[in-house]
Curated annotation (Swiss-Prot):
The modification Phosphoserine is found at S19. GO terms for molecular function: mRNA binding; single-stranded RNA binding. This is Protein BTR1. SUPFAM superfamilies: Eukaryotic type KH-domain (KH-domain type I) (SSF54791). It comes from Arabidopsis thaliana. It holds the Pfam family KH_1. Residues 1-34 are annotated as: Disordered. InterPro entries: KH_dom, KH_dom_type_1, KH_dom_type_1_sf. Residues 34-102, 120-188, 233-300 form the KH domain. GO terms for cellular component: cytosol; plasma membrane. Induction: Not induced by ToMV infection. The gene is BTR1. GO terms for biological process: regulation by virus of viral protein levels in host cell; RNA splicing.
Length: 313
């Protein structure tokens, strides 16, 4: 899964007039319904959004009224080197928060390339697999109508079964700022109709319980970020048969990287010949909160057991 930085922008005047006011009471109620949106940014871009001491993200929350969370440094969406930003609030607050973030990222990128013509860019939304059917619609009718109305390119990735526990798909939007934001309006309105989606507001990594997100309080916090309470970190060492260490590592370290990313635990494997006392099992040391250790231990066992079962069949 390739990693792409995706930015877009618009002038303050465009941002103010782009989103139409609700026409009736039902639309007004929908606009106030709690919702959220998640999207990917590079690690460097995440730092720009946070700002010094959390000043930028605190300002964005105060202006938009939305809550903005990020996955931690080096905690990426599986298969990428991108972090997740989640914005939650009413539809209006979420859209306003997203516009502020994308406008800042694009203005910085635009200053670097010096291009006078606004390029077509990409933004990748993170959407639960269970909610993608509503975006696609029967026979693809809904997504086709969204493409026609917004003029943006919209592509939904297949569910990647390579990564254990991953239940999200990427919805890639390509186009100008106006095209992307119109597509986001349409998609977010459709997602908010799904009660399961609206209730699923936990953290940027709702499927990876081992991760802690970083939160920034919008007012009265002096711009300092607040972390979820962290559990005490411990180390547990387990034994894995020498011939099965390759299953834990994976090709090019893929498996151990996946386990580390999905659980938040740190994993260290002993050198060849360095065995658990009285065995030929290599030492696998797992460090982190108890819950992360348990998850990592389970995933390691599954990697080994799946290969053992194939061998005995």
């Amino acid at each position: 899964m390739e990693s792409t930085e995706s930015y877009a922008a618009g002038s303050p005047e465009e941002l103010a007039k782009r989103s139409p006011e609700p026409h009736d009471s039902s639309e007004a109620d929908s606009a106030e319904k709690p919702t959220h949106i998640r999207f990917l940014v590079s690690n460097a871009a995440a730092g720009s959004v946070i700002g010094k001491g959390g000043s930028t993200i605190t300002e964005f929350q105060a202006k938009s009224g939305a809550r903005i969370q990020l996955s931690r440094n080096q905690e990426f969406f599986p298969g990428t080197t991108d972090r997740i930003i989640m914005i939650s609030g009413s539809i209006k607050e979420v859209v306003n928060g997203l516009e502020l973030i994308l406008d800042k990222l694009h203005s910085e990128l635009h200053a670097e390339d010096g291009n006078e013509v606004e390029p077509r860019r990409r933004i990748r939304l993170v959407v639960p697999n269970s909610s993608c059917g509503g975006i696609i619609g029967k026979g693809g009718a809904t997504i086709k109508s969204f493409i026609e109305e917004s003029k943006a390119g919209i592509k939904i990735s297949p569910l990647d079964n390579t990564f254990y526990g991953l239940s999200d798909r990427l919805v890639t939007l390509s186009g100008t700022f106006e095209e992307q934001m119109r597509a986001i309006d349409l998609i977010l309105a459709k997602l908010t109709e799904d009660d399961h989606y609206s209730q699923n507001v936990h953290s940027p990594y709702s499927y990876a319980a081992g991760y802690n997100s970083v939160n920034y309080a919008p007012n009265g916090s002096g711009g300092k970020y607040q972390n979820h309470k962290e559990e005490a970190s411990t180390t547990v060492t387990i034994g894995v048969a020498d011939e099965h260490i390759g299953l834990v590592l994976g090709r090019g370290g893929r498996n151990i990287m996946e386990i580390t990313q999905m659980t938040g635990a740190r994993i260290k494997i002993s050198d060849r010949g360095d065995f658990m006392s009285g065995t030929t099992d290599r030492k696998v040391s797992i460090t982190g909160p108890q819950r992360a250790i348990q998850q990592a231990e389970t995933m390691i066992k599954q990697k080994v057991d799946s290969a053992t079962e194939r061998t005995t069949d």
